[in-house]
């Protein structure tokens, strides 16, 4: 797929399936993307993703990972230690210093050993109530942006849901169902499984929401844990936890998602 991209065949009108990541604010979207890419992304309270972040992961046996940001016709090289700051700086250039959003995309190319060959678009988390510094119509702005990306039939919708919420009332589920009623191109990633293990088995086995591509339950990386430590703890969690160990092993863990 990446070879075709390089040939610019997309200009001929061939559509590539892209994975569009959607979720309510604080659902754990950034954590899922971090786990797949093995790099730290901007995190924090409130809205972190303020522009469409196109992440292109390429598995390369490089001694040192190569990270490049592309936006506004610029190309900026960065590294794992500084990528989060570089994304924040680029976001401010694209969307301003406040808390507003912009439809101008920011591309992050990651060439790294062991990452899956994937292209994903991370979109702002859905928020219903504008906080200080956000435009009054922030919900409509975010919804319009999400709909633009998930409408194409080629888009695979990766819906990030916190284990603590009722899936049937999730705004991101409502949006994806409005364009993919049968759920044939919708995959759900359930985050924070360790925080809300009660009833999770029943939720992912229920037929209340059409998730055609199924569920994957994950444990989010906590604080300064290394990615290796986080994966080991995740594996143990789903193996030995009295409730979570009952969930089918084919739908648990970040490696399954990759």
Go through each PLM region and give its residues:
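N-terminal pre-Walker A segment at the start of P-loop NTPase domains
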Residues: 1-10
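Globular "head" domains of long coiled-coil molecular machines
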Residues: 9-258
């Amino acid at each position: 797929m990446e070879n075709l991209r390089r040939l610019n065949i997309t200009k001929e009108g061939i559509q590539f399936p892209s994975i569009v990541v959607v979720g309510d604010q604080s659902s754990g979207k950034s954590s899922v993307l971090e786990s797949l890419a093995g790099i730290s992304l901007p995190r924090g309270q409130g809205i972190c993703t303020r522009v469409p972040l196109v992440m292109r992961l390429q598995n390369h046996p490089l001694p040192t990972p190569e990270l490049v940001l592309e936006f506004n016709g610029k190309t900026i090289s960065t590294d794992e230690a500084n990528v989060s700051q570089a994304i924040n700086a680029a976001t401010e250039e694209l969307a301003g210093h406040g808390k507003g959003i912009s439809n101008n995309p920011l591309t992050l190319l990651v060439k790294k050993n062991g990452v899956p060959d994937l292209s994903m678009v991370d979109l702002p988390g859905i928020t219903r109530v504008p906080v200080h510094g956000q435009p009054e119509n922030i919900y409509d702005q975010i919804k319009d942006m999400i709909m633009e990306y998930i409408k194409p039939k080629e888009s695979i919708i990766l819906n990030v849901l916190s284990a603590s919420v009722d899936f049937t009332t999730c705004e991101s589920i409502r949006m994806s169902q409005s364009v993919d009623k049968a759920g044939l191109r919708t995959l759900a990633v359930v985050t924070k499984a360790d925080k809300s293990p009660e009833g999770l088995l029943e939720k992912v086995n229920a037929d209340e929401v059409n998730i055609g591509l199924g569920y994957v339950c994950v444990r989010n990386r906590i604080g300064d844990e290394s990615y290796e430590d986080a994966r080991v703890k995740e594996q143990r969690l789903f193996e030995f936890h009295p409730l979570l160990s009952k969930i089918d092993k084919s739908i648990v863990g970040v490696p399954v998602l990759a």
